[in-house]
């Protein structure tokens, strides 16, 4: 928001405070002033001159030789290259010795043999940005009104002896998107009164209903619509002081009618739109949602396709404006306009925001509607605009306002106690001090025994709860005056929760095992969201995703780890071992908070042991991945309760995948990627695992039992059992352990064989069995008896026979 210091002074007394001092006070109150800029930029010696004569330069086709009266004894000759310079004009002249922006000094000179004693200036040469210069003067010099006094200070007449404060407003302070709103803020800071502009309208004897009617078919989008008719207007330039204020605020002047609507926008923060009444094509205004397939050509001459999500102003048949955003070319004010319909409305933020997004049209008006205006001042702004059009466009205001409204002013009442204010701020303010601050803010209130009941003005949409009032009191009291105190509390050393400590042990173990930690996106694409997931649910979609690739929340960590492995392999890093600890997100139904579960996942591809001087290279395989997990389970005393069960999972190799169960509950899986998936990610043989980390770390560990060092020798027997190919080694091992109790202490698989020496559909599993009794030395007969019992048990359960 650009705020003219001189213009602001019309609403609040700024005596005794400079623009820079005011900027500092505003910043201290919580609204940042990014810069203070002097519009005159140090210029001096620029006066209003009268072009007495203007003739072609004898030696240059594009130059003019002008005789200019500067209000001095004799007129001076000035050579000018502007295409629009002409006899009789009042122009800005930089005299010899004048200083223009950039410390450019004007000197007497000869141009193509003719003497030039000064410079006739364009607005750009006086420091005005091209984008705000009126179009008729964009490529030439500026021409003053005919009543401008010769020899007067041109900078003063152009309103450039002013300073502009640029406010950086947070979204909650939409009230300061107007000069009056800023005036209320400054008045509160300085403890002064606000002087509001007069909006008295002189009406004729006619009534507006003879000209037009209004019907709103979408009151939820447009709670308030009002309008006035001004007839017999004469389109022309607006007064110079108004043009100067518009340009200082970054708005290009057009004509008196359009400039007045923009002036009210800046003054009240209320967007207005002026229609050429005779071009509306009917005597009614209908506000409704657009119909599918409708189009409108807006003021920028672009045809825009409309949908049912857009709000339009129509003449009962076709759109004449995209509500709150831009008017239509079919009803714009032109040089021959004589009757104007002024629209003042309150459009709700969502419908305006949708139109801005769909059409890429953001304007000063739409910005204010998006952030919220004060509907209580809508008709006041309309009256002010009608009064100005009567004064500066020669218009005749038709009696009455046409209106359609369902808006009702809801008074926001907030109660807060003095004790609460002082308790939050750490101050010792009195009731009188708080009352003075609320009075400066112009918040109506009552006070009863230290309890303040505040009726929040409609302009302050950001005030709703007691904390908002406390913040306002703190701002005006002065943040720099709040006492600085150290917290009064017992200092205690920090620490980790048991769960956090376990998670840290997991990281240390995996990194010690040779894996590197990865951190990947929580967002993924819909087609990858449920791949590899332990549990699946309807993917949770973002309301406004940046792209489809990052539009839903993940349900597994593996897809992004595979992308990381593929990324590394594409850059010649063939051996990859990564793990990630992160959250996955599962929908629990509509209006229910989604579940956020922590997972541990890993990916292994390439060599596990590479370039070992003492041994051969070893590729990552199923047993490497399983061994890493076994070590993790053993770390937390869970190994005895873990079971690996063959499983078939989508995207994994059907014969090299196992589900992992803890106490009968599946908590994860480990396996090789399906060859098709390996090809999809451009990976060689790759192994992955994923665990429900929360279940793992919350599981109760087995108590560690002391066993003395063996005093007696153990006996080791090896057996090779021929079984069907579908028999699981784990199941066979468990049967051996059960049948061999209590003497069989350890069973380990050391060989698997399939080949020509075995019948079709058979395989050989070789186990090593260790027999031991802590109380005595076992005899061969005792071991043989138990060994026979083991063989009988596996034969009965699995049809296993000793391999010959």
Swiss-Prot record:
Record carries keyword Protein biosynthesis: yes
An MF annotation (GO) of this entry: ATP binding
Annotated ranges, domain B5: 409-484
A Pfam family annotated for this UniProt entry: B3_4
SUPFAM superfamilies: Anticodon-binding domain of PheRS, Class II aaRS and biotin synthetases, Nucleic acid-binding proteins, PheT/TilS domain, Putative DNA-binding domain
EC number: 6.1.1.20
Domain FDX-ACB: 710-803
GO CC annotation terms, alphabetical: phenylalanine-tRNA ligase complex
Requisite cofactors: Mg(2+)
GO biological process: phenylalanyl-tRNA aminoacylation
EC top class named in words: ligase
Catalytic reaction(s) noted: tRNA(Phe) + L-phenylalanine + ATP = L-phenylalanyl-tRNA(Phe) + AMP + diphosphate + H(+)
Localization of this protein: Cytoplasm
Residues the record lists as binding Mg(2+): 462, 468, 471-472
Keywords from the named record: Aminoacyl-tRNA synthetase, ATP-binding, Cytoplasm, Ligase, Magnesium, Metal-binding, Nucleotide-binding, Protein biosynthesis, RNA-binding, tRNA-binding
Cofactor, how bound (note): Binds 2 magnesium ions per tetramer.
Main location: cytoplasm
Domain tRNA-binding: 40-155
Family note: Belongs to the phenylalanyl-tRNA synthetase beta subunit family. Type 1 subfamily.
Subunit structure, interactors included: Tetramer of two alpha and two beta subunits.
Protein name as it appears in the record: Phenylalanine--tRNA ligase beta subunit
Source species taxonomy: Bacteria, Bacillati, Bacillota, Bacilli, Bacillales
Gene: pheT
């Amino acid at each position: 928001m650009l705020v003219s210091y001189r213009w602001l002074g019309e609403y609040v007394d700024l005596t005794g405070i400079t623009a820079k001092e005011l900027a500092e006070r505003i910043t201290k109150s919580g609204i940042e002033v990014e810069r203070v800029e002097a519009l005159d930029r140090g210029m001096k010696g620029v006066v209003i001159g009268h072009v007495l004569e203007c003739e072609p330069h004898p030696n240059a086709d594009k130059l003019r030789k002008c005789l200019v009266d500067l209000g001095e004894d004799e007129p001076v000759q000035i050579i000018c290259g502007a295409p629009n310079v002409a006899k009789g004009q009042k122009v800005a002249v930089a005299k010899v010795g004048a200083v223009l922006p950039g410390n450019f000094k004007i000197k007497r000179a000869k141009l193509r043999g003719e003497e030039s004693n000064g410079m006739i200036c364009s607005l750009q040469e006086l420091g005005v940005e091209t984008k705000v210069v009126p179009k008729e003067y964009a490529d030439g010099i500026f021409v003053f009104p005919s009543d401008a006094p010769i020899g007067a200070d041109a900078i003063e007449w152009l309103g450039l002896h002013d300073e502009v404060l640029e406010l950086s407003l947070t979204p909650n302070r939409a009230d300061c998107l107007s000069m009056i709103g800023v005036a209320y803020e400054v008045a509160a800071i300085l403890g002064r009164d606000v002087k509001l502009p007069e909006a008295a309208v002189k009406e004729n004897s006619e009534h507006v209903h003879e000209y037009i009617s209004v019907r709103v078919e979408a009151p939820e989008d447009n709670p308030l619509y009002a309008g006035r008719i001004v007839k017999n207007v004469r389109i022309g330039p607006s007064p110079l002081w108004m043009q100067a204020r518009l340009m200082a605020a970054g708005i290009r002047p057009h004509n008196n009618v359009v400039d007045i609507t923009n002036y009210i926008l800046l003054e009240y923060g209320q967007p207005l739109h002026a229609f050429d009444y005779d071009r509306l094509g009917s005597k009614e205004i209908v506000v409704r949602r657009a119909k599918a397939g409708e189009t409108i050509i807006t003021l920028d001459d672009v045809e825009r396709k409309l949908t049912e999500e857009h709000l339009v102003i129509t003449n009962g048949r076709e759109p004449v404006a995209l509500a709150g955003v831009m008017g239509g070319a079919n009803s714009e004010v032109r040089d021959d306009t004589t009757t104007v319909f002024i629209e003042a409305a309150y459009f709700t933020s969502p419908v305006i925001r949708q139109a801005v997004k769909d059409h890429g049209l953001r304007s000063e008006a739409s910005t204010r509607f998006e952030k919220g205006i004060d509907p209580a001042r809508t008709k006041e702004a309309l009256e002010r605009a009608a009064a100005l059009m009567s004064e500066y466009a020669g218009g005749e205001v038709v009696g009455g306002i046409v209106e359609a409204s369902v808006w009702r002013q809801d008074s926001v009442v907030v109660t807060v106690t003095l004790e609460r204010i002082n308790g939050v701020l750490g101050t010792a303010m009195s009731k009188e001090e708080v009352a003075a601050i609320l009075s400066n803010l112009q918040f109506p209130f009552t006070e009863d025994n230290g309890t303040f009941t505040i009726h929040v003005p409609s302009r302050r949409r950001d005030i709703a709860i007691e904390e908002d009032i406390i913040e306002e009191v703190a701002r005006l009291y002065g943040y720099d005056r709040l006492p600085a105190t150290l917290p009064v509390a017992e200092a205690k050393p920090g620490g980790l929760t048991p769960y956090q400590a376990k998670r840290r042990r997991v990281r240390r173990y995996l990194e010690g095992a040779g894996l590197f930690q990865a951190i990947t996106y929580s967002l993924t694409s819909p087609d990858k969201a449920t791949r590899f997931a332990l549990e699946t649910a309807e993917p949770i979609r973002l309301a406004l995703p940046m792209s489809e690739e990052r539009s839903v929340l993940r349900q597994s960590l593996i897809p992004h780890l595979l992308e990381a492995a593929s990324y590394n392999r594409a850059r010649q890093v063939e051996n990859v071992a990564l793990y990630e600890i992160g959250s996955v997100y599962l929908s629990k139904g509509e209006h229910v908070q989604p579940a956020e579960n922590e997972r541990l996942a890993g990916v292994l591809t390439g060599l596990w042991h590479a370039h070992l001087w003492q041994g051969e290279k070893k590729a990552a395989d199923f047993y490497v991945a399983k061994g890493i997990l076994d070590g993790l389970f053993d770390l937390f005393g869970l190994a005895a309760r873990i079971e690996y069960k063959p499983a078939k999972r989508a995207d994994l190799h059907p014969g090299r995948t196992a589900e992992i169960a803890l106490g009968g509950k599946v908590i994860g899986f480990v396996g090789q990627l399906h060859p098709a998936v390996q090809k999809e990610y451009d990976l060689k043989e790759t192994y992955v695992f994923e665990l429900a980390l929360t279940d793992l770390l919350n599981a109760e560990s087995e108590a560690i039992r002391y066993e003395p060092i063996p005093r007696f020798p153990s006996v080791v027997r090896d057996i090779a059992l021929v079984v069907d190919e579908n028999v699981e080694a784990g199941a066979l091992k468990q049967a051996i352990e059960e049948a061999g109790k209590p003497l069989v202490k350890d069973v380990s698989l050391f060989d698997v064989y399939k080949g020509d020496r075995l019948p079709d559909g058979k395989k050989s599993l070789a186990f090593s069995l260790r027999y031991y009794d802590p109380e005595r030395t076992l005899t061969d007969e005792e071991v043989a008896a138990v060994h026979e019992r083991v063989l009988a048990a596996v034969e009965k359960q699995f049809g296993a026979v000793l391999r010959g």
